Amino acid sequence: MTETTSAKPKKVSKPKAKPTHPPTSVMVMAAIKALKERNGSSLPAIKKYIAANYKVDVVKNAHFIKKALKSLVEKKKLVQTKGAGASGSFKLAAAAKAEKPKAVAKPKKAKTPKKKAAATKKPTGEKKAKTPKKKPAAKKPAAAKPKKAKTPKKKAAPAKKTPVKKVKKTSPKKKAAPKKK
């Protein structure tokens, strides 16, 4: 009797395709670094940079870009010079600039007093800690990726802008010179 019961075949889950771009927060930070604007980079400027340098549909990922900006401001990696929320201008925080040199300096100090074996163990622990953080960030863009098939339609829509009609300037007709009597 166990043979007569039909078992449903298990659905084979397809492995999620890895996104062709880094996490949104990394792209936003790179955009602000590259733009180097004195008063901070605006949201449209950041989107324009991301669209030009990464294979990302900015219209569909606008939500993720805004979310990344807000979270980076909360983490104090960015400073909002103008506006509120995700609008306005953003600069790299002084703390974010100073963190990178400190992070490089700390492992060097740790290696000198300890044995080589202990020093090699530390970087492996750091790598293990970093990998789980990257995976959740990669899942979010992967969920948005299947929607990319629709992008050509949206890109075509802005291209259909109505041409601006050029107004021809008609020069005033010269009046015939009055006949001499």
Curated annotation (Swiss-Prot):
Location in or out of the cell: Nucleus; Chromosome
CDD domains attached to this UniProt entry: H15
S-S bonds: none
Record bears the keyword Nucleus: yes
Protein function: Histones H1 are necessary for the condensation of nucleosome chains into higher-order structures.
GO molecular function: double-stranded DNA binding; nucleosomal DNA binding; structural constituent of chromatin
Domain H15 intervals: 20-94
Protein name per UniProt: Histone H1
Chief location: nucleus
Organism: Tigriopus californicus
Keywords: Chromosome, DNA-binding, Nucleus
GO cellular component entries: nucleosome; nucleus
Start-end of Basic residues biased regions: 8-19, 103-119, 145-181
Family per similarity comment: Belongs to the histone H1/H5 family.
Annotated stretches, region: Disordered: 1-23, 81-181
